[in-house]
Amino acid sequence: MSLWLFFVQTVLLIQCALGGLPNAKDYLVAPDLLPGLNDVKDKELIPEMHAGHIPLDDGDDDDDDDEKNYFFWKFHDLANQTSVVASKTLIIWLNGGPGCSSLDGALMESGALRIDDDGEAYLNPGSWHTRGDIVFVDQPAGTGFSTVGDSKYDKDLNQVSKHFMKFLKNYFKIFPDDLDKDLVLAGESYAGQYIPFFANEILKFNSKLDKDDNEEESRSGKKYNLKSLLIGNGWIDPDQQSLSYIPFALENNLISTKADYFPDLLNMHSRCQNLVNNNGGKKFSFDECEDILTKILYYTRRKTDENGNKVPSNQECTNIYDFRLFDSYPACGSNWPDDLPSVSKFLGKPGVMDSLHLDVDKVPHWRECDSKVSSHLKNKNTQPSIHLLPNLLKHMQIFLFNGDKDIICNSRGVQDLIKNMKWNNHTGFTNDAEYYDWQYYDQFTDDTISAGFVKHESNLTYVSVYNASHMVPYDNALISRGIMDIYLKDVELVVGKDNQDDVIISKDFVVHSDHSTGEEELSADQKQDEDENSHKDRHRNSDKFEIAVILLVVFSITGTIAYYFLRERFRKQIHAILIDPENRPPSSNKSVAWADDIENQGDDFKLSIDEAPSTADKPAKNKSGYTKVPNTDDDSFELDNL
């Protein structure tokens, strides 16, 4: 450990011990201490980073949070790659589990860094930090690098929410400028529970400030500017989503109605349906329902391939996070993603934890998921987050995006929970819902890729992402970043003609690669600026040149004003999803608790994702048309519904 890092960590410990919080500069990460970043040729592309522990202790002697610390890692763009609206946006990213580290997101998904096979960091060209500052948080306590000490683990989502609010309060004390930014809560999987619960607490916090103007707040009484929730492949409605497993597996030819095991699966589905119908929303989830997926994996275990050849042991089980892949049994995806060993290698390298301001004597080595967190979080007296969504939709935009190759939180289940949810005086998407094909334009290859489709109504947006797994940004970060572009309205709209669907096109207004030489081709404007600067240096004292520059500026400003006036005058009418809502006219360990005791064994292999987009996830032209999950009045399971 360097003397500087030792000094910084000592300062952090002293400040925490005295009840104070460190300053933002105390959390600064030196990029040259992270293996691999010294090899980045264009150093300006390396984001500003802050990382470390933020204590949850708020001076309340009645709680036991003294030893709870949440680890965070923040990325801020320094290369002017963000738009104006993105520069005013703060994204907080949460991974799921429960108990799985958000460093999955930081180092394998939407974060600024990716890790190679040697455990060296390189820049992620599809990082979301170019669409807003992004903060990855390990929570609840005990997850990833976050510590629980001798305190108790959280038992339900209400406790988790209370602790997140403590983290948020102290975070904004350390980074007060972020209070003025638009807050976006984003994440995936079990974060489909976390995010709505946290949003609900933020609404209550803001409401309390409205009611009690005289209350003295250490944060000057400012509200949190929560604007949107982005939930990817979320576990939101355990009942409805468990009932999607058999229909989804049939739609994707993962099981067959002609198989000997199919009657047993039908019986399990029927038992689950009966429990759900008689639940009344009182129980968080049923083991009998979640066991359906476990049984599907058991029955579809492969011993031989279609040619009768013995299957390698690491290819026996379908990967529940990406059904194009296989894994050993009973891991069935727990060894995935392929980058996971590299991330562990990176975080275990000398100096990395020091650079992240972590005391190696007090913080254990990094584990992706912690079973103690998931085993304690039972939610015995808690309803799932689906019950919170209707009210949240009155106050903010909610985006539910889904990779279409995921099984455990599959697109069928998410579409069905939308279909059965009542909000804004209607149930599910109506015939008035907006529908768009979503395309991604690759400026390097000049190709347009079919990325998915988008459906929107009354503050709710559903985004299907083609050829993507449970971890959408892992498969294609550039395309996944288009979800943020849709939220930020940084997309192009092509209005369909002759009964064709409208098309949303996302593309990168700036895309950089750390593998570049630092001599990338300049845009026309950049070349002009460079030429002008050079010209000024050579003729600094020339009166004629100064006059020419003044005239050039005048003509440039005039031309720019004229361009924007004409563009606004003749541009196509943008649909509601792309209009500011305020101006809109009225109209499991790693898995989701399915196998906590699953063994981690074997290596999975990866198939190519460059295939034709799936059509199973795409609704019919009738905008209200979704396939049905069996849910009959007589509590029975009808095969015809499949």
Swiss-Prot record:
Sequence ranges on the Cytoplasmic membrane side: 566-642
Segments in the Lumenal topological domain: 20-544
Swiss-Prot/TrEMBL GO biological process terms: apoptotic process; proteolysis
Ranges of Acidic residues composition bias in the record: 519-532, 632-642
EC category: hydrolase
Protein name: Pheromone-processing carboxypeptidase KEX1
Signal peptide from the UniProt entry: 1-19
Documented EC number(s): 3.4.16.6
Family matches, as InterPro entries: AB_hydrolase_fold, Peptidase_S10, Ser_caboxypep_his_AS, Ser_caboxypep_ser_AS
Family: Belongs to the peptidase S10 family.
GO molecular function: serine-type carboxypeptidase activity
